[in-house]
Amino acid sequence: MAAVTQFLSQPSSIRGTLNQYQLNQTSLSRIPFLSLKSTLKPLKRLSVKAAVSQNSTKTLTKESASSFDHCFKKSSDGFLYCEGTKVQDIMETVEKRPFYLYSKPQITRNLEAYKEALEGVRSVIGYAIKANNNLKILEHLRSLGCGAVLVSGNELRLALLAGFDPTKCIFNGNGKSLEDLVLAAQEGVFVNVDSEFDLNNIVEASRISGKQVNVLLRINPDVDPQVHPYVATGNKNSKFGIRNEKLQWFLDEVKAHPKELKLVGAHCHLGSTITKVDIFRDAAVLMIEYIDEIRRQGFEVSYLNIGGGLGIDYYHAGAVLPTPMDLINTVRELVLSRDLNLIIEPGRSLIANTCCFVNHVTGVKTNGTKNFIVIDGSMAELIRPSLYDAYQHIELVSPTPPEAEVTKFDVVGPVCESADFLGKDRELPTPPQGAGLVVHDAGAYCMSMASTYNLKMRPPEYWVEEDGSITKIRHAETFDDHLRFFEGL
């Protein structure tokens, strides 16, 4: 893109350039058939561990989790419904290939739960675009007042295309390029400083763009979020953030560059799939200590940015998990006591439970010791089980004949890898060929991590509207799309 390659020579706003890339809104067809150096003493290195937190939150109740009830439900007749619309009917109308199906009303309900929790607190709900980067979903979240958390230059460009207010956007990352930082400076987004070289690049970007950059310092709090190591981002071994014993160096550097940098806050990020909200309070207590010290050195910081996402009930086992209200209540008084603006970065908890990945059964087989349901979807479209050994609930969309044997299956795809599975040892009725099968809670880190391995093309996406009608919100990729990368070579 010309807008990308010419940043350094063209410091003017990129918005006008991006307009030529606006998607044709009419191309997303509507289907009418169904109604993110000082003299002061060095700061003491502090460490907190969630496992020994003394600030336990109130007991969670099933009522507190009501905002996150599942939008996909089985009826007494054995059919799966999304917002009252039968999934089997949708399968019979759309393209005969795997697809992602969302509930637009559930996206709204999830965001409203955060907005309700944040009442009385100056805040920004920064949706983590990495969780799901569908443009139509971004536009919907923006229309509901969401900000955006970005971890790449292209996510920043997409946020601008979706109409997000740049002053409600936060640019994270441990390897931000100079070109992307120039764009961030031009547009006025917040930038979280991750390292010494990152700060130097932000200073250079400010000089190129001619604009002062609002920055927050990403401090690694060394908090144990008790999650999968691949999604833990706030412990001492993480590649992200500033070591707290180095904080004074960064404060001195910001003071040395008053034209380029304005320090407005502090940031930490804990990880993903967090189910113990005391971790957030432990981190907030530590971050407040840092903010108090930063203010004592003359900085007028007004933002506390706590990143890290709530977990969800992937097992569909009735687990009572913390809600946005539970989360915010752990830090509310701390934030208010320091007159801070709170920035949070939900991704998974906003979008995961709004979607399922819909597949067709190609056939059933056995190797003598293990049974397999082979489907047309695969690790190419949904890699979480293969990559993280993650569990996502699987079920059939319609009832099977009474005589269908119920047994344990591995649910696998057609990709030429033994790691190509969506679920292992799942007890299911033996499905007939062509039956519909869904992988639940597929709204986050599924489509955004999809690939074209084995030339499996990325699938289409649809959502169920408030009135029950179905809208295509992303076209399927095709073989012709793949060939375009080689045109003129």
UniProtKB/Swiss-Prot annotation:
Chain positions with N-acetylalanine modification: 51
Binding locations of pyridoxal 5'-phosphate: 309, 345-348, 445
Xref: CDD domains: PLPDE_III_DapDC
UniProt binding sites for substrate: 348, 384, 388, 417, 445
List of residues that carry N6-(pyridoxal phosphate)lysine: 130
Catalytic activity, EC: 4.1.1.20
Family: Belongs to the Orn/Lys/Arg decarboxylase class-II family. LysA subfamily.
Described function: Specifically catalyzes the decarboxylation of meso-diaminopimelate (meso-DAP) to L-lysine.
UniProt xrefs under PANTHER family: DIAMINOPIMELATE DECARBOXYLASE, GROUP IV DECARBOXYLASE
Name the record gives this protein: Diaminopimelate decarboxylase 2, chloroplastic
Organism encoding this protein: Arabidopsis thaliana
This protein's encoding gene: LYSA2
